[in-house]
């Protein structure tokens, strides 16, 4: 963080501490329809036009440490195979054989020098190219180059693996914009995966997400974190601490 950023942060904290009303020219926002959180049709639209066109965190390099290691990721409605092609590169494909659509990978994690469909034995390399099929003599005028696995766009942010189902999507760096440079201080390339937990919540995904985007609930839910000087406490920056800013 350079001096200009430090001064800007101090000015913002000072402004927020003194503020007694909404910021000037703050727009009047409409109420959100309740169906945005309950309607299946709206959720289906989100999956189609949001999740399929966004960069999604799919894993960590520590989960596929060796060349040929793979992970089956199925968190967005489309099972994806993440493959450690080399030390620096990861490839990603839909978990669907180009012959009859059978799943190629069944286990969540594994390692193999090639990807083999267990149904009819079609075989693919780590780039998704079809490199072998059983009884090739029975396939007349067959072009193997047209039968590669369907790719999923994949990029690394340090040791973090991100995927995007939209092959024409802008790069992860372009998508993050100015945030990309700001988050470099976290040094994702030096972070190791120690453990991970999965929690299933009986709510729409936006309910869980928004709970981590606002502090309006802190006084009620996290009362042990709330002090008499909460207005100032909430404006602090604890570098290296376990704080949500």
Regions found by a protein language model. Name each.
Residues 223-226, 242:
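Short, low-complexity export/processing leader segments characterized by acidic and small residues
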Residues 226-233:
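Conserved small/polar residues in nucleotide/adenosyl-binding loops
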Residues 60-63, 220-224:
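A short, aromatic/hydrophobic, helix- or strand-capping loop or linear motif
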Residues 150-222:
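Extended catalytic-interface subdomain
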Residues 1-96, 100-107, 152-156:
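N-terminal pre-ligand scaffold of iron-sulfur
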Residues 237-245:
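Hydrophobic alpha-helical segments, chiefly the membrane-spanning helices
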Residues 63-167, 173-180:
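Rieske [2Fe-2S] iron-sulfur-binding domain
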């Amino acid at each position: 963080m350079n001096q200009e950023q430090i001064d800007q942060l101090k000015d913002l904290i000072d402004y927020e501490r003194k503020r007694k009303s909404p910021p000037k020219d703050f727009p009047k926002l409409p109420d959100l329809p309740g169906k945005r959180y309950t309607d299946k049709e709206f959720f289906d639209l989100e999956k189609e036009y949001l999740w399929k066109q966004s960069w999604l965190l799919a894993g960590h390099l520590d989960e596929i440490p060796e060349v040929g290691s793979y992970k089956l990721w199925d968190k967005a409605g489309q099972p994806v195979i993440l493959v450690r092609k080399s030390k620096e590169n990861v490839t990603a494909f839909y978990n669907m054989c180009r012959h009859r659509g059978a799943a190629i990978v069944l286990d969540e994690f594994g390692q193999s020098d090639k990807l083999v469909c267990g149904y009819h034995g079609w075989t693919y390399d780590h780039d998704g190219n079809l490199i072998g099929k059983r009884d090739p003599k029975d396939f007349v005028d067959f072009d193997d180059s047209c039968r590669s696995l369907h790719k999923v766009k994949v990029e690394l942010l340090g040791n973090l693996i991100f995927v995007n189902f939209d092959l024409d999507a802008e790069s992860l760096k372009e998508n993050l914009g100015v945030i990309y440079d700001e988050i470099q201080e976290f040094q994702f390339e030096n972070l190791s995966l120690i453990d991970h937990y999965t929690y299933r919540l009986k709510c729409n995904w936006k309910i869980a997400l928004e709970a981590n985007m606002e502090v309006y609930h802190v006084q009620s839910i996290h009362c042990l974190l709330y002090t008499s000087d909460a207005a100032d406490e909430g404006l602090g920056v604890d570098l290296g601490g376990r704080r949500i800013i």
